[in-house]
């Protein structure tokens, strides 16, 4: 069994990242997390090298004229085209559509493993943030084999490309830093996985 999934810091970091990508920065789920990242205390508790985290921490605190809720709206809601859509099927489906074949494959996998996960609204389950929240839930419930499968089959095949584009087009220092923190953290997880990451073609 992959030991990193059994550590408390895996579930905590997955839940923190998942919430920050999934919920508005003003929501009760994320407002305390936003404030924590604007301070320096979080770095000592994040399971990455302090030297790697230092520039990320500095970027979190960089001022921007655009308000954080406005940036979140622009990046995750619209009304204009999202610069880096957070749903897996947009990257994995040839037509770049929501509810694509990869979403259906995720749903089938969830059914086969008896996993029920409530979404905020009628949206695809393959949202980057919701997949991280699901990974945290699986780890917290000692379902480490399913957590590995979720990461290797349904998240890692597209998450690196999503994060690269997200960072390049974030347009706000907080979300640019969040993308970099996610990229560093997920790279560490992937390096420690036992099962191989599925190789899938990307269409964006």
Predicted segments with their positions:
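Charged, alpha-helix-forming regions
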Residues: 1-204
């Amino acid at each position: 069994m992959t030991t990193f999934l059994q550590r408390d810091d895996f579930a905590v970091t997955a839940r923190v990242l998942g919430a920050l990508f999934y919920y508005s920065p003003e929501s009760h789920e994320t407002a305390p997390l936003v404030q924590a990242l604007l301070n320096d205390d979080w770095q000592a508790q994040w399971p990455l090298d302090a030297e790697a985290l230092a520039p990320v921490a500095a970027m979190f605190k960089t001022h921007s004229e655009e308000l954080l809720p406005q940036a979140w709206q622009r990046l995750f809601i619209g009304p204009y085209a999202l610069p880096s859509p957070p749903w897996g099927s947009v990257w994995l489906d040839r037509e770049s559509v929501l509810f694509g074949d990869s979403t259906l494959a995720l749903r089938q996998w969830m059914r086969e493993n008896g996993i029920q996960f409530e979404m905020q609204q009628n949206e695809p389950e393959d949202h980057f943030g919701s997949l991280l929240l699901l990974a945290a839930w699986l780890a917290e419930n000692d379902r480490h084999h399913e957590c590995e499968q979720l990461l290797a089959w349904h998240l890692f095949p597209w998450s690196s490309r999503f994060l690269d584009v997200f960072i390049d087009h974030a347009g706000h220092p907080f979300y640019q830093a969040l993308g970099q923190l996610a990229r560093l953290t997920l790279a560490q997880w992937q390096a420690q996985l036992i099962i191989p990451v599925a190789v899938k073609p990307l269409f964006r």
